[in-house]
A protein has these predicted regions:
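Short, strongly patterned local motifs
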Residues: 451-454
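Aromatic (phenylalanine/tyrosine) cluster motif
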Residues: 438, 448-449, 459-463
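Cysteine-centered motifs
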Residues: 428, 446, 456-457
Length: 463
């Protein structure tokens, strides 16, 4: 019998066993990647189109082309699509990124013939109806206006624009007027250019049967579909970074300020990227990170602060995120630079590095434990142009990095001079009163309430 009073032994995984997908090239040239895993009678189909923000001719074109696929086809109205998918217990997801559009179907195996029929119609014969498009645009405009009043939204988009510039797809800021320029013909032209059998790939994951594979081959692999079978050009853009060190966005009614600090970083194919991930995790990538331990736990300037690398084609964006009271903005930024100095000058203690290793290896194990998460991993690897050994290389980087390497990487890639500071909120001219450390604040509150409860008990005992 298991003795639950004894803590299980902690051990590092030697290597992660991540099965590779089986690849079949169908008659029309579409690659079909198959991950047959799991016991539940459910499958997920991901159809990827190489057509995102990088390829669009105007802002929002790629996003709304993808978003409108479910709003009506030659065979099904938007209501019929929603009703039938709900009836069969299926789920459809549509999303768009820098270079790709994703059309994802979750379906029970026993209803796969019915749901695949709807899926095929969505992919091959959308209508982009004007009425439905108008409703969606109005809804998105309202959401955009709501977001535009939030300090975190304003700070984030200002940072990306400051780092990449107006001529870069990442740095182009969407305005309210851009929504009004979207119409069915704009979406149809983007669809005709990029949504075709010569520009897509399919991933099939879950409890996959040969019957499911045959159905996909029949519907999507037997004949070419679409109008323009040219592969998209590989576009490259040069960031035009602003010379301003700090940008302030005034929000006079803001109760707190959003702070974003960022700069250009490595893309995922750089030889140092995997070890820089360890550095950034140590810096601000998990709850026990340097930024959290100092700025949240010790200083109490914020409820949460984090750092991470946002991946884009040909580059990455290192971002530090936090929200704080208006009077503590300067103190918070000062401590961020202090933590960078520590990483550049001091060696990381062995115990702290071991904790980061355990966190990152455990997170990797969770990321590859199901058929769908495996599909996500391989989609990420293939769309990023990474080698099949990426997972093995990532584990090796986490396990072998040394404190000396971390210090060298911090000196090379955490450059304080190029780190942009974006603050969105209310200007505060008075000096901040340094708050109690967060843990001490909690203890003080507990002691206060204990005294109150004790005094009440004493009071009632006398009377």
């Amino acid at each position: 019998m298991l003795d639950r009073t004894i803590q299980p032994r902690i051990c590092e995984p030697e290597q992660l066993a991540v099965p590779s997908p089986e690849c079949r090239v169908m008659k029309n040239g579409i690659p079909l990647y198959i991950l047959n895993a799991g016991d539940n009678e459910v499958v997920r189909i991901d159809l990827l189109i190489e057509g995102g923000r990088w390829q669009q001719n105007q802002r929002l074109q790629a996003l709304f082309t993808n978003r409108m696929l479910r709003e009506g086809t030659r065979r099904y109205s938007a209501a019929a699509i929603a009703e039938k998918l709900d009836y069969y217990g299926a789920w459809l997801e549509l999303s768009s990124s820098s270079e790709y559009a994703y059309i994802t179907l979750y379906s029970l195996n026993k209803y796969l013939p019915e749901t695949l029929d709807i899926f095929e119609s969505i992919v091959k014969e959308p209508l982009f109806p004007e009425k439905e498009l108008g409703v969606i645009i109005d809804s998105n405009i309202q959401q955009f206006l709501v977001n535009s009043s939030k300090v975190d939204f304003l700070a984030h988009r200002t940072l990306i624009n400051a780092v990449y510039g107006d001529t870069h797809p990442c740095g182009q800021l969407v305005q309210k007027e851009d929504y009004h320029l979207i119409n069915p013909s704009v979406l149809q032209s983007f669809y005709d250019r990029y949504y075709h059998s010569g520009n897509c790939s399919i991933y099939l994951a879950g409890k996959v049967s040969e019957d499911a594979i045959r159905r996909i081959e029949t519907l999507f692999g037997s004949e070419p579909f679409g109008k323009d079978f040219r592969k998209p050009e590989k576009l490259s853009y040069v960031p035009v970074t602003s010379s301003e060190k700090r940008i302030f966005i005034e929000r006079a009614d803001a109760m707190q300020s959003a702070v974003r600090m960022g700069m250009l970083s490595l893309d995922r194919r750089h030889p140092d990227y995997l070890k820089v991930r360890v550095l950034v995790t140590l810096f601000g990538g998990y709850f026990g990170s340097r930024l959290m331990s100092n700025i949240r736990e010790d200083k109490g300037y914020t409820y949460g602060i984090s750092a991470g690398i946002m991946p884009y084609p040909d580059s990455g964006l290192l971002v530090v995120n936090a929200e704080t009271a208006n009077e503590f903005v300067e103190l918070l930024i000062k401590e961020v630079y202090h933590e960078i100095d520590r990483l550049q000058n001091d060696l990381v203690p062995a115990e702290e590095l071991a904790m980061v290793r355990n966190y990152m290896l455990g997170d990797m194990c969770r990321s590859y434990e199901s058929a769908f998460s495996l599909a996500d991993a391989w989609i990420f690897i293939h769309t990023s142009g990474l080698p099949d050994s990426y997972v093995r290389d990532a584990v090796e980087a986490v396990k072998t990095i040394t404190p000396v390497e971390i210090r060298e990487l911090a000196s090379r890639y955490l450059c304080k001079e190029t780190l942009k500071e974006i603050v969105s909120g209310k200007k505060c001219h008075k000096k901040g009163v340094i708050p109690l450390p967060f843990s001490r604040l909690i203890v003080s509150l507990c002691k206060y309430y204990i005294r109150r409860v004790t005094s009440c008990c004493v009071y009632t005992s006398f009377y």
